């Protein structure tokens, strides 16, 4: 009996332990598209659309120094884009257009991340495009990813 009481006291002592407070990071904020500068919106949309339309036409116009950062220009080569386009075209068909989903502002880096839904001929697989625009109105990252379909 004595052991049970001691065990219960120890259990009570550990169960009353104070909880750690979770710190919420306010540096990344969801922003309304109207609140973003039009030049940033247009830059993200135009470069994303130009990249995806090159999959339809097989002609890619390289990004300029005033449009994208050096890292993006080095990674966006004709060879890399053509191999990615072949995979995407096989799975999804021709590129039709972009639809803006949301805009996220990273306050620490002062960047805007634009997320677009990519519309293709085949509706079997959904893809998203994310374009990151810096404070200098240059694209610092472009990425596409396949979105898992939600079960019914």
Residue ranges and their predicted role:
Residues 4-13:
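Sec-dependent N-terminal signal peptides
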Residues 105-152:
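Exposed beta-sheet edge and beta->alpha loop/turn motif
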């Amino acid at each position: 009996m004595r052991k049970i009481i001691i065990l219960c006291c120890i259990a009570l002592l550990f169960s009353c332990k104070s909880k750690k407070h979770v710190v919420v990071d306010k540096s990344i904020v969801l922003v309304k598209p109207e609140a973003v500068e039009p030049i940033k919106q247009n830059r993200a949309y135009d470069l994303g659309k130009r990249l995806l339309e090159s999959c339809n036409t097989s002609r890619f116009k390289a990004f300029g120094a005033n449009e994208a950062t050096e890292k993006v220009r080095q990674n966006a080569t004709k060879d890399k884009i053509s191999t990615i386009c072949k995979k995407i075209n096989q799975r999804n068909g021709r590129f039709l257009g972009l639809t803006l989903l949301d805009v996220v502002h990273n306050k620490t880096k002062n960047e805007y991340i634009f997320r677009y839904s990519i519309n293709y001929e085949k509706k079997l697989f959904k893809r998203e495009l994310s374009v990151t625009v810096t404070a200098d109105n240059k694209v610092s990252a472009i990425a596409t990813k396949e979105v898992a379909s939600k079960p019914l």
